[in-house]
Amino acid sequence: VNNYNDSQKSKFKGIGFGNNHDNTSSYQLASILKAHKIKVVETDGKKFKYFIPLQQKKSKLIKAMFDSQTKFEDSLFYDVSAWTFPLAFNLNYEFLKEKLSGNELFDKRSGKISGFSSYGYLIKPYDYNIPRFINFLQENGIRLKSSSKIFKIKNNYFDYGTLLIPVVGQSKKPEKIFELLTDISKKTGIDVYSLSSGYEDNIGFGSNSFTTIKKPKIGLIVGNGIRSYDAGEIWHLFDTR
């Protein structure tokens, strides 16, 4: 009750964090908050992806997680004393004096594909799950390319590194490619954009503006001289993420 009363006196209405560039990292932080029974609202994403109202019972915990403390009265402190949750996820955040409207977050966001294409598909390169997305397709024999130019399709901007999955020249049939993309899009929360032609905004999707991504061969060194914690962290990343 005291927490709630204190939150009503605050000049801030809540905290905004996250963006539409990296849905996965934004959601991971939101899911941690939900696990602690903190209310999180999913917004339209124009300014921030999520909004945390401060007028709730755990307002002090919320502030502790988002406060950026740089000065300490004591000369001795643990490294966790300076941890700020959103920075651990490389996310922007801001204490806001106005509320952001939206729906309370309940379930994990599922990625979507804009439709079937006979030409190809595009994926923006920002999301934390992009390596997983690429690996899944390469393990299924799908050839991918990466853009060396910025381009636009119907007011939708695509940055350097945008992924292209051409339909022509693949070992899989177009229907199978669409099925695989639909599957990994749902699992990773990454949106897939379907192409309606092979040429847009002065860029040809069969041109040298796109470079084929080679499947990597990765080795993990373990044993004497290697900290088991470091090796385990990388192993877990590759094995589960």
State where each predicted segment sits.
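Intrinsic-disorder/low-complexity accessory segments
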Residues: 1-241
